[in-house]
C-alpha cells in the first residue's frame, strides 16, 4: 500500500536505523512525488526529501501532533477538539497540515520513539485523529521490522551456520561486530 500513498507523516522514527527497509521504500516514494513529512527527535539525515520537518524533544511529540491536528482542522474547516482549543500551531505544524490536507492517499506512521514514549497513548490518539481528518490511515513501524525484513531477505544462518546464541555457547576464534554496542544493543536476558 505504501507505493500508492501521496502523503506520509512519519512520527518518532530514526528511519535509517530503526526501519531501513521502510526508509528505502519511502525514499523511492519521495522520488515519485509523494510528500513526506516528519516529526522526529534525532534531527538525523533521512536521505530523502522531506516536505516539512519538526525536530523536537521526545517529550514534545504529543504537543507537536496536537499543533498539526489543530492546523489540519482549521485547514479542512473542521471543528477543533475542545481539549485542544488553546493550542497554537507553529509554521512547521501548519506546513505539515497543508501537505496532509492536499493528499488523497494519506498515512500517518508511528515509529519506535513514538510507541515507546511514556505518553504513547496520547501520541497514538492524536495521530489517529490526524489520519482520520486527512482521510488516511494510521500505521505502526514496529521494533521487530528489521528482524522480519532480515529473515525475509534471507539474512539468516545457512547450512552449517550458527545463530548468535550458538556462537556464544560454542566460542569461535574471532568475531566481527559492525555498528553495534554489545552492552547496549544485545539483550542477554
Regions found by a protein language model. Give the residues of each.
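Cofactor-pocket helix-loop regions in the catalytic cores of large enzyme subunits
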Residues: 1-189
